[in-house]
Amino acid sequence: MNNNRFMSSSNAQATQIDLGLRSYMLGVYNHMTTALALTGFMAMGLNFLAISNGALTPIGELFFLSPLKWVVILAPLGMVFYISAKLQSISSEKARNLFYIYAGLMGLSLSSLLLVYTGESVVRVFFITAASFAGLSIYGYTTKKSLSGLGSFLIMGVFGLIIAQIVNIFLASSGLDFMISVIGVLIFAGLTAYDTQKIKNMYYAADDSETAGKKSIIGALTLYLDFILMFQFLLSLLGNRE
């Protein structure tokens, strides 16, 4: 009798954890998807206002040719550092709002890609990235194998990638640029799986609803960055230039 009660209690607890995990991960993906939609809307909106009859409008000149372009480029970086620094001291609702502001700023920053690549190739690469991301994230969620070792290796790879990009600013080597793009795709593909598993494991810590909400936001931000960076590297490889 006692054994049956214990088994019943264990099964009920496991079911509750499973349902809670699904709800938590769904929240992460919902925040991420909303942020991506906002990024796309802002990028296309600015591009629409910046280009007329194949030439830059005054708004386009302001955002892409004036010193304001550096604010547009660097604002997302400043925002992500601000969110990371303030995450512990702000509410989950404010963290969510800051994340969406960051996504909007990223859209303004990425709008210049629509000046470089054809709209058709941008859309095509976006769907390639989305399909790849989905498969990799599902793998990270379902695999029983720990990816922590892979994650440490990939994070070191990110630093190497940054150094290579800085070096190539001075070398302007098309061959090195191609290698950077290939390696970048591989690194952020791996990080998508690793980060998904890490975000999933974060759920199992006993947290209050406010902390869980913040974890959901930081998880969405992490996967959002994986997606955006993988998209940019794939676009460099597969995009058709104007």
List the model feature ranges, each with a label.
Residues 1-242:
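A hydrophobic alpha-helical transmembrane-helix feature that marks the membrane cores
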